Amino acid sequence: MFAECFENVRSTCPLIHNITNYVTVNDCANMVLACGASPIMADDAAEVEDITTICGGLNINIGTLNSRTITSMLLAGKKANLLGHPVVLDPVGAGASQLRTDTANRLLREVKFTVIRGNISEIKTLASGAGTTKGVDADVADKVTEENLDSAVAFAKTFAARTGAVVAITGAIDIVADAHKAYCIRNGHPMMSSITGTGCQLSALTAAFVTANPGHP
């Protein structure tokens, strides 16, 4: 299945609109290019609806959040929904500040997401409406382990059912779930926590894949 999905990205070369954070914007653009899709990184409210219209999918990342981009995210997200385009949410740092938590919750209320990808603390914050994170990293107390994996999977499936989105919780063990089934992935490496941007790049990559493979969200 992966080979087929990958080939679909390369053969269709979908244009992906990324409203993402300034720390990793270049890395995300290169990741989208490397997989065979095409990125555009427009975040001004005056043009985001136009840009979303010409794109196939939208990636929203709240990593370097500000009042200007909040407006842009809402405009682009609603436009994408109107057009039937897939939308990915990366709620970076949800729970670290009231602004981030409130914005992530508002996005969930006003935009329909195809995929929600974040670390376990961020996803728990979205599920409860409040929470705490260690900056943009997952709280150690929330870490998904083999011992608590069953409960983490059940949580992911419940949140997926509530939102109608595929929920991807990334960490030492990744969980990808919809309301009915879940997959656990154990291909991570401790060094990934020593650099910034791997999650942001994954969200951008996810947007490219779900856009090119509408039958496999």
Task: List each model region and its residues.
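Residues that cap or flank secondary-structure elements
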Residues: 20, 68, 95-96, 147-148
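Conserved phosphate/ATP/ADP-binding segment of small-molecule kinases
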Residues: 100-182
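Short beta-strands and strand-loop turn motifs
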Residues: 58-61, 86-91, 135-139
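Glycine/small-residue-rich loop that forms an oxyanion/phosphate-binding "nest" at active or ligand-binding sites
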Residues: 69-118
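Small-residue (G/A/S/T)-rich helix-start motifs and N-terminal tracts that mark the onset
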Residues: 1-74, 79-81, 86, 153-217
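Short gly/pro/ser/thr-enriched loop/turn and capping motifs at secondary-structure boundaries
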Residues: 48, 94-95, 122-125
